[in-house]
Amino acid sequence: MLFNINEKGEPLVISFAPFLSPEAIKHLQENERCSDQSQKRTAQQIEAIYTSGQNILVSASAGSGKTFVMVERILDKILRGVSIDRLFISTFTVKAATELRERIENKLYSQIAQTTDFQMKVYLTEQLQSLCQADIGTMDAFAQKVVSRYGYSIGISSQFRIMQDKAEQGVLKQEVFSKLFSEFMNQKEAPVFRALVKNFSGNCKDTSAFRELVYTCYSFSQSTENPKIWLQENFLSAAKTYQRLEDIPDHDIELLLLAMQDTANQLRDVTDMEDYGQLTKAGSRSAKYTKHLTIIEKLSDWVRDFKCLYGKAGLDRLIRDVTGLIPSGNYVTVSKVKYPVFKTLHQKLKQFRHLETILMYQKDCFPLLEQLQDFVLAFSEAYLAVKIQESAFEFSDIAHFAIKILEENTDIRQSYQQHYHEVMVDEYQDNNHMQERLLTLLSNGHNRFMVGDIKQSIYRFRQADPQIFNQKFRDYQKKPEQGKVILLKENFRSQSEVLNVSNAVFSHLMDESVGDVLYDEQHQLIAGSHAQTVPYLDRRAQLLLYNSDKDDGNAPSDSEGISFSEVTIVAKEIIKLHNDKGVPFEDITLLVSSRTRNDIISHTFNQYGIPIVTDGGQQNYLKSVEVMVMLDTLRTINNPRNDYALVALLRSPMFAFDEDDLARIALQKDNELDKDCLYDKIQRAVIGRGAHPELIHDTLLGKLNVFLKTLKSWRRYAKLGSLYDLIWKIFNDRFYFDFVASQAKAEQAQANLYALALRANQFEKSGYKGLYRFIKMIDKVLETQNDLADVEVAAPKQAVNLMTIHKSKGLQFPYVFILNCDKRFSMTDIHKSFILNRQHGIGIKYLADIKGLLGETTLNSVKVSMETLPYQLNKQELRLATLSEQMRLLYVAMTRAEKKVYFIGKASKSKSQEITDPKKLDKLLPLALREQLLTFQDWLLAIADIFSTEDLYFDVRFIEDSDLTQESVGRLQTPQLLNPDDLKDNRQSETIARALDMLEAVSQLNANYEAAIHLPTVRTPSQLKAAYEPLLEPIGVDIIEKSSRSLSDFTLPHFSKKAKVEASHIGSALHQLMQVLPLSKPINQQTLLDALRGIDSNEEVKTALDLKKIESFFCDTSLGQFFQTYQKHLYREAPFAILKVDPISQEEYVLRGIIDAYFLFDDHIVLVDYKTDKYKQPIELKKRYQQQLELYAEALTQTYKLPVTKRYLVLMGGGKPEIVEV
């Protein structure tokens, strides 16, 4: 029940329907099942929408309508009296939050239109108005709200900013690291610390590897609930626990014994084959058969009697025995077919070799790890202190502050728990432990609603942990009193061809060991409508493999990028779809695993005329060719003796010196100088005093003179003008901005150059001045291996989409091509010198000196890198986690398709026919095999091989070079734009002649009106201040009563230790204050403070305003009192526009500006302008701004047809306010 007030002030009572009981939900499900609606809600969707009063975990498979369920549940809550602001709704991205908010808004509008109850309309309208304030957003956004509101409780200012720029973070980290590193190198335990650094960096001079280790440990800790506690208690957990053979986890022993038994079973299967050759011609057992029987018998015995014969303490002995028993090769050959019987066991043995030696030396690395723990803790504290000082934080800092606020303040925590009716989370499978802790603190323990799909958890690189979802799933199934699990299995997106192949692949591939979930019946995809089950034979999934037999047979299949042949296969299929099926390009999407090395796709598609839109690449703004050319130009202007930058500028299209030119210049050295820079050689070449003046011909001399003249003008301008103007002068002088417009990706290149000028402008506005500092800042960003954000440009709509699998999540496309299926999964992390694990902490490779094991030797030391036991433990878990995420990536990619999915790869046809496994023992691929295979393609081929008797719903086709000829690929059919029978089409010469005439006419016009071409259409009084004097006659003028101004904001790293307040910001704040100051009240400090709160400036700027000086102006000067006396005649901050004529080109242009204040009387006008400039004598500013006030007076006179009798400058930049009449 809710009370509202009507127009007469009378209470309106709204009675809401109660939440549905389980019986009512079942009744609703039955009614829906029996209804004749074309699109019915499933029973599980209804259950997820209406179940209340308990924790709910919704496991929503791909395309099952989870967003629909969330929106319907939110609407149902609202209709039952739960205000939208009492729901906490967390989304994974800002974009998802915006889309969800829009859907709720549309539902509310629809509900208002359908409702006839006036009271309900009022209530729903209120909900609509509250929607923009509701807590619908990312966890980061909510954490910012909490800290902004309650940060004071833990000593954090509410006036903070978020450091989203990686470059800024990198610079601050580097400063903290360098200072801390110096301190540790000079402490008491310095020898141990030096040994630690050498273990990772090789020496103490190059600290890059050690620095990366510290940064990674810090970042990893930030994803935990409490970074400090994790570093103190968990960081060395495995190092303290696993120090003996007996400490090896049982699971690892079980995997080894399983591999031994599997090997024995496989070998027995092979020996039982008819063609194996058990007997010799004489009828006795063959030597091979006898040897293999011995292996089978001993492996089986050792597995069965492991505890009696060996136990954990004897594990090292078992490894030696098994290694000595089995052959060194992986294969057993029968009738020329190779069976990889021993391959898996060899890999397992490799994991356990040298354990005894490793454990002997492992204890020596523990003091190093303690030093690392101390350093990372100190770094975390020091880095946070710097951020607090700057009042600039990362998102993880804000989340931890929010957790701390809620943990340490019971009243604040309880207020949130009481306020929120329900805590809803989308994409729950991608939460990390920090976010989970925050959600737990917001919930009252029985009001959580979590939606996700563990099969789509693909953000481990953001420290997302799918086990959070998994643990909830298990807990709620075992203990229903804790919460309810609801499965959404019906897929409403894809045709049966896509659903069937997805089920076939993952039922053989995914389980809890690899994939983190058993892909059984409760997780399989089911068509949600009859229309999806209609078969289309031409939409069967295709695994298209380029046959690499004719390539270099030893070429690795794990190349980073996709091959030209694979892209050609894709182009051929797209041309066929477009020509034969009429499929529009925008219905086709190419999915890749990463955003790099995809240029060959765009290049090949351009050759075939297929339009394509790419997702871009990594941030490479500063590495784009056009930006690098401009940066080298700026470096040369700053220091012409920088040879690298100078050569780059000379070779650039701006001056186009070739190798021959540079060689001739390089020979113009001074024999008396040992070192001679290129700039000096250029100067000697011009005056003919080089070592070989005869090499400088007239053409080259002319180019050199032009270069030196241009460079000289740029260097002179750099001392006088702004960076922004300098960059545009370079563009205009050498036509570089126009040049890039003629190159590939012209729009992107021009956007990059334009952004460079804007970023330079923003840099100077942030408090830094000068070319040198700008270059230094850019170089510092590059040193930290960071970059600035890329510039986005509009993309064509009718084109094939190319994007990463991660980017495609949540989207759907009719036709999907999964490219580069032969690319090996990135296992870089498992080969690093350290591996981190949330439970076990850190495991490292230890650089041990094993000189003592070698006896007498002349060597000073023998260093060997050893994988410590904690490292091996973490490595195995990381390997499985990586494979699991890759498996889920494949699931996400396949389930994006609506109609058909293609897999594109490259393989040797002859090698692929080797038997993967002699016998299938289960519905799943053997675990050892799944761990061993490292590409999507390998998984698919193994499934096709082992389960060949089943219908797997995809075909494997090898494509030969003969299938990829120009004739075989074909070409796009484009509409005929011209009539071939029309004779006018043959008059090409006439058309070309006409075009040339037009170009000539344009050139003549450009010459005649050159001044007008370079004339801006809009100018400001400031730009005209020193341009054209005296002022020429105006033609038209108008005063604009109301206007809004918008400022473009381009963010660059801010490196200052203390916030710098710009004079321009103070001036802007003063003008705002003078505009809003109420003159009807007495002007005093309180009046000014009240008005100051209403202006749009930060606190530093407000604090910098001298309110006493403003008060003095109104109280102590006659003009200030004039303001208060004649306030009814006063107009403040009035924009104007005036049409003027350029004295050179005689072209018209618009002059715009804003008049600070003027008094309009019946017969005259008084003009006032405020200035905050610093000055020595008032006459300086009078001369500086006289012309500007003349322009203002002229605009007023033309508008009102009245004379401006008085013009005043109010000077606020001195010790006291001064009034100057102009």
Swiss-Prot record:
The lineage of its organism: Bacteria, Bacillati, Bacillota, Bacilli, Lactobacillales. One of its GO terms (biological process) is double-strand break repair via homologous recombination. GO terms for cellular component: cytosol; DNA helicase complex. InterPro entries: AddA (IPR014152), DNA_helicase_UvrD-like_C (IPR014017), DNA_helicase_UvrD/REP (IPR000212), P-loop_NTPase (IPR027417), PDDEXK-like_dom_sf (IPR011604), PDDEXK_AddAB-type (IPR038726), Restrct_endonuc-II-like (IPR011335), UvrD-like_ATP-bd (IPR014016). Its EC number is 3.1.-.-, 5.6.2.4. Its cofactor is Mg(2+). HAMAP family: AddA (MF_01451). Heterodimer of AddA and AddB/RexB. This is ATP-dependent helicase/nuclease subunit A. The keyword Nucleotide-binding applies. Keywords: ATP-binding, DNA damage, DNA repair, DNA-binding, Exonuclease, Helicase, Hydrolase, Isomerase, Nuclease, Nucleotide-binding. CDD domains: DEXQc_UvrD. Disulfide bonds: none annotated. The heterodimer acts as both an ATP-dependent DNA helicase and an ATP-dependent, dual-direction single-stranded exonuclease. Recognizes the chi site generating a DNA molecule suitable for the initiation of homologous recombination. The AddA nuclease domain is required for chi fragment generation; this subunit has the helicase and 3' -> 5' nuclease activities. ATP binds at residues 60-67. Residues 524-810 form the UvrD-like helicase C-terminal domain. It comes from Streptococcus pyogenes serotype M4 (strain MGAS10750). Residues 39-495 form the UvrD-like helicase ATP-binding domain. GO terms for molecular function: 3'-5' DNA helicase activity; 3'-5' exonuclease activity; ATP binding; ATP hydrolysis activity; double-stranded DNA binding. Belongs to the helicase family. AddA subfamily. It catalyses: Couples ATP hydrolysis with the unwinding of duplex DNA by translocating in the 3'-5' direction; ATP + H2O = ADP + phosphate + H(+). SUPFAM superfamilies: P-loop containing nucleoside triphosphate hydrolases, Restriction endonuclease-like.
